[in-house]
Amino acid sequence: MIDAEGFRANVGIVICNSLGQVFWARRYGQHSWQFPQGGIDEGETAEQTMYRELYEEVGLKPEHVKILAVTKNWLRYKLPKRLIRQGSAPVCIGQKQKWFLLQLTCKEQDVDLLQSGHPEFDDWRWVSFWYPVRNVVSFKREVYRRAMKEFAPTAMALSSKPAQGQRSKRRRKN
């Protein structure tokens, strides 16, 4: 769904473990890393989209996570001109995103990047909470910063609780 201003409605997903680290995934066949995200389909709510994308991209079901927070407002970024598909109608100039902070409640081995027939990611790892803000592609940085700033109090409270057996090493599934 692209709005009148040219922004595609989308959700962003931040999954954290009990150590306050976040799930960071590498785009399939590329060198870029990002959080899971995906477009809202006609008739879907942001929460329904989040669960659909979570399953399609990461292989996790609603019972594998707990929603901790949702951004109060839509966060927007514009695409660089080189990524705007001219000739498509309507023209999408960027994304407007509702972000979800989730707590992983299952074993990390339940992550399955190959769940769909067309994987979005080919590798993943746990990283420190603020790492993605510095390391995502430049045109997404401000949205990441705003989402993470809003989620920080909740995520930091979670990481101050005793760990529940979560490992913090890199996990590869492909």
From Swiss-Prot:
Disulfide bonds: none
Top EC class, one word: hydrolase
Cofactor needs: a divalent metal cation
Gene3D superfamilies the UniProt entry points to: Nucleoside Triphosphate Pyrophosphohydrolase
SUPFAM superfamilies in the record: Nudix
Location of the motif Nudix box: 38-59
GO BP, one annotated term: mRNA catabolic process
GO molecular function, one term: mRNA 5'-diphosphatase activity
Domain Nudix hydrolase: 6-149
EC number, as in UniProt: 3.6.1.-
Keywords in alphabetical order: Hydrolase
Biological role: Accelerates the degradation of transcripts by removing pyrophosphate from the 5'-end of triphosphorylated RNA, leading to a more labile monophosphorylated state that can stimulate subsequent ribonuclease cleavage.
Family: Belongs to the Nudix hydrolase family. RppH subfamily.
Protein known as: RNA pyrophosphohydrolase
Organism: Pseudoalteromonas atlantica (strain T6c / ATCC BAA-1087)
